[in-house]
Amino acid sequence: EISSKIHQTINTDNLSWNENCIAFYYVSKLANSLNLDTVITANGIDELFCGYNAYREAFSGGDSQITKVMDTKLDNELKMMKAVNLIASEFKVKIVQPLLSSKFIEYAKTIPTSEKIHDSEDLLRKHIIRKLANHVGVPEISYTKRKKALQYGSKIHKALLKSK
């Protein structure tokens, strides 16, 4: 079974890491079947632009608390993407995350928190990204909706929870 093979390869019980590695296993397999050797992702956007509920919870602690959450989430994401690339390498595919480059991280951290999240009740978040999407012509239905993470939309999360 793929999930146990991945669990063994990445050697962690972290549910999110396992879910993401399973999802990218299939993404990489598909990319390879299409003769692609690189897949570019938007990983890092939620970490850098306050996309998680943890940022709502941290909001009352001000910028310093939000920065602390951001640094923790970025550290986890950078490590997880190494595991993802280990899985993708089976198909000779590289998963690239331009939003997790050190230069982009440095830039994103200069954007005011108020452009990312408005308050502790803000369910939409990532406002500057949504404004940019509108500006460049992304259809409204795409930039006004909350996104669903790959592991949830693909039902991997549910399947893994059921198998435990």
Model-derived features with residue positions:
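Conserved S-adenosyl-L-methionine
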Residues: 138-148
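ATP-dependent adenylate-handling active sites, centered on carboxylate activation for C-N bond formation
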Residues: 1-136, 150-162
